[in-house]
């Protein structure tokens, strides 16, 4: 997973290619809804494993069947290639 800093144009271009993700300030954000808490927690466990593999961890929260995920690269105080790569992997779950 590349830790490449992106220009604003590159960020906007890649964000436009992702479904249901949106740019919020310096973060890439998405909400996920599941049948119930157990399914939401199973999803979070899978995301945690992906995040550990990538050594890149989301800001997230969970309330019952909803999981909010925000991705950012603190090193750049912006969205980087790592965030887009992780978002795409999360979308494959």
Language-model features, listed with the residues they occupy:
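Short Gly/Ser/Thr- and Asp/Glu-enriched loop/turn motifs at secondary-structure junctions
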Residues: 25, 62-66
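Solvent-exposed alpha-helix faces
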Residues: 45-46, 88
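Short arginine-rich
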Residues: 20-23, 48-58
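Helix N-cap motif at beta-to-alpha junctions
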Residues: 36-37, 76
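A short N-terminal helical cap/helix-turn-helix that marks the beginning
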Residues: 55-59, 90-93
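C-terminal structural segments of small proteins and small subunits
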Residues: 67-93
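Short amphipathic alpha-helices within nucleic acid-binding modules
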Residues: 38-44
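N-terminal first-folded block
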Residues: 1-35
